[in-house]
């Protein structure tokens, strides 16, 4: 199966300082790829390069088997962007926000209703964005991204500042898109989120990829259990693997109002990240 996206030895610098150095990664159809890193590690720069918003200084970017030194219209049409809720128009309704992009991509109006229904905002089609909650805005951003049925969607910290219930809703949307064969490239600060959703992850540190691979393999490398512990209202504790399959079970518990709390191995995973950062610093000495 050909990769949707292939990045080889990508390089970018600002003021003669490398912010991305020898970046290599690939994404297959239906894959969820997670990019993690501390502030200033280059996550935003990388996603801006991959979406054609800024130029690279070196290396190759290949979409659908063709090298893209310049982004053609077919590449832009193949990608959906859900990067910043501030790009939504507060004074316009949900429907009007999507109508603008329907015109740009020459999409039938029926697709607007389909996209709103997909993200469970069909009853808010006439609601102004300024009246939406953070979770609803994020879902509208995803609706806009899928409007033209792209092959790959870029998400920038899609659950940042969201409560657990809204986070779960976004996770379900991401997994649903994956099941349809859509590739997802997402940045996140949440290690447990990356472990739960992603097929592969990369940790950026000091302008380079310090860790890359399957989340389970990384857990094994650092001797992590990667478990979820679900505390139910009846006092029962359910232990699950922290992966996409467990999302279905958790969704059922939430739907039945049974969950009191969810505990993950996030603190342990943060230790992994810190050890990677420390490793990078020791290599500089």
Task: Place the predicted regions along the sequence by residue.
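Short, charged/small-residue-rich alpha-helical element at the C-terminal edge
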Residues: 217-285
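ABC ATPase "signature
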Residues: 212-213
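Catalytic Walker B motif of ABC-type/P-loop ATPase nucleotide-binding domains
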Residues: 153-157
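Conserved ABC transporter NBD signature motif
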Residues: 59-70, 74-75
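Helix-to-loop junction immediately C-terminal to a conserved catalytic motif
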Residues: 51
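Conserved ABC ATPase "signature" region
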Residues: 99, 103, 109-124
């Amino acid at each position: 199966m050909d990769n949707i996206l292939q990045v080889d030895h990508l390089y970018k610098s600002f003021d003669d300082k490398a912010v991305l150095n020898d970046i290599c990664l690939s994404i297959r159809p239906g894959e969820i790829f997670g990019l993690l890193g501390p502030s200033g590690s280059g996550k935003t720069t990388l996603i801006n390069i991959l979406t054609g918003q800024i130029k690279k200084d070196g290396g190759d970017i290949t979409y659908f088997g063709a090298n893209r030194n310049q982004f053609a219209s077919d590449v832009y049409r193949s990608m959906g962007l859900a990067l910043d809720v501030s790009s939504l128009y507060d004074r316009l309704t949900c429907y009007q926000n999507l109508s603008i992009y329907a015109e740009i991509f020459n999409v039938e109006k029926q697709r607007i209703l389909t996209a709103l229904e997909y993200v469970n905002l069909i009853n808010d089609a006439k609601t102004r964005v300024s009246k939406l909650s953070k979770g609803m805005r994020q879902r509208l951003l995803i609706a806009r991204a899928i409007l033209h049925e792209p092959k790959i969607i870029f998400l920038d910290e899609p659950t940042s500042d969201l409560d657990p219930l809204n986070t779960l809703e976004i996770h379900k949307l991401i997994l649903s898109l994956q099941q349809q064969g859509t590739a997802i490239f997402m940045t996140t600060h949440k290690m447990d989120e990356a472990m739960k959703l992603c097929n592969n992850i990369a940790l950026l540190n000091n302008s380079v990829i310090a860790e890359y691979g399957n989340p389970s393999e990384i857990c094994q490398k650092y001797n992590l259990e990667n478990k979820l512990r679900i505390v139910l209202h009846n006092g029962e504790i359910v232990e699950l693997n922290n992966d996409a399959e467990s999302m279905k079970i958790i969704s059922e518990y939430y739907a039945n109002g049974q969950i009191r709390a969810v505990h993950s191995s996030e603190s342990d995973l943060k230790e992994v990240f810190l050890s990677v950062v420390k490793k990078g610093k020791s290599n500089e000495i």
